Amino acid sequence: KWCFRVCYRGICYRKCR
């Protein structure tokens, strides 16, 4: 499983695949 940070329009969150 890979987790990485996603930032969009000033909001960052963690996404895992």
From Swiss-Prot:
Which keywords does UniProt give here?
Amidation, Antibiotic, Antimicrobial, Disulfide bond, Secreted
What is one term from the GO cellular component aspect held by the record? extracellular region
Organism annotation? Tachypleus gigas (Southeast Asian horseshoe crab)
Which domain of life does this protein belong to?
A: Eukaryota
Give the UniProt family note.
Belongs to the tachyplesin/polyphemusin family.
Q: Name one GO biological process term.
A: defense response to bacterium
Kindly provide the name given to this protein in its UniProt entry.
Tachyplesin-3
Coiled coil regions in record: none
Which cysteines does the record link by disulfide bonds? C3-C16, C7-C12
